[in-house]
């Protein structure tokens, strides 16, 4: 059943369609679910969304998700402070953590280079990563960008920026299918990819 393009329900559908991976039909199903749900359940969902927007930010050091100035990984003194694993999105850090394959620091780019879409080095704040390595103490930077054209371009660009600084620059191994986002890979594949990384 099509939702009338006017009114409150249509407004909710239009907002849900803006979410990644949500098409018109899924948005309509979700909107009707919210409508049929108990008022308290719907309000809990709305409050959870508001709390995320009000209570979370990006870590000032690595740009991962944080409830304060620094994320849980940057605050953990037990993590290997000599290695940085570079990912495109915060969700990838949690996928890697579930795999249990890595105990170092992270750097989240919040995207990948895409000149056709107008996304350049300043948009992914590549200079912040370079500055972290320049501060010293970093022995290895592991690039875990997705095996897409944009991810490869980002890895090549970062390698060219980081190699002259003296830290080892490696790339995770390909156990991850080309064209797939890393965050959707299973834990074993991520574990093998990190263990089989190669120098660049």
Task: List the predicted regions and their residue ranges.
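Solvent-exposed alpha-helical segments within well-ordered globular domains of core cellular machineries
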Residues: 10-14, 28-32, 43, 47, ...
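Cys/His-rich Zn2+-binding cysteine-cluster or related metal-binding knuckle/ribbon modules and their
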Residues: 3-9, 18, 26, 31-84, ...
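Residue-level signal for pocket-adjacent positions within structured domains
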Residues: 29-30, 57, 69, 91, ...
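Catalytic cores of large soluble enzymes that bind and process phosphate-bearing ligands
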Residues: 4, 37, 41, 117-121, ...
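Post-transcriptional modification and biogenesis factors for structured RNAs
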Residues: 3, 15, 198
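Extended interfacial segments that mediate partner engagement and assembly in macromolecular machines
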Residues: 27, 75-145
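Long C-terminal interaction/binding lobes of large macromolecular proteins
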Residues: 11, 103, 130-200
């Amino acid at each position: 059943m099509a939702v009338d393009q006017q009114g409150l329900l249509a407004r909710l559908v239009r907002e849900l369609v803006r979410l990644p991976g949500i098409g018109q039909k899924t948005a309509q199903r979700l909107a009707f679910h919210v409508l049929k749900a108990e008022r308290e359940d719907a309000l809990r969902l709305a409050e959870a969304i508001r709390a995320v927007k009000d209570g979370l930010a990006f870590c000032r050091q690595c740009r991962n998700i944080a409830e304060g100035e620094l994320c849980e990984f940057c605050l953990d003194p037990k993590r290997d402070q000599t290695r940085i694993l570079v990912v495109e999105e915060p969700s990838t850090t949690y996928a890697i953590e579930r795999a249990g394959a890595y105990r170092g620091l992270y750097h989240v780019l919040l995207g990948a280079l895409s000149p056709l879409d107008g996304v350049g080095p300043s948009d992914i704040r590549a200079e912040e990563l370079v500055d972290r390595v320049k501060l010293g103490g970093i022995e290895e930077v592991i690039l875990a960008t997705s095996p897409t054209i944009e991810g490869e371009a980002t890895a090549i660009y970062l390698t060219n920026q980081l190699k002259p600084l003296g830290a080892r620059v490696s790339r995770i191994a390909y156990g991850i299918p080309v064209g797939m986002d890393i965050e959707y890979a299973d834990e074993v594949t991520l574990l093998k990819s990190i263990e089989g990384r190669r120098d660049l």
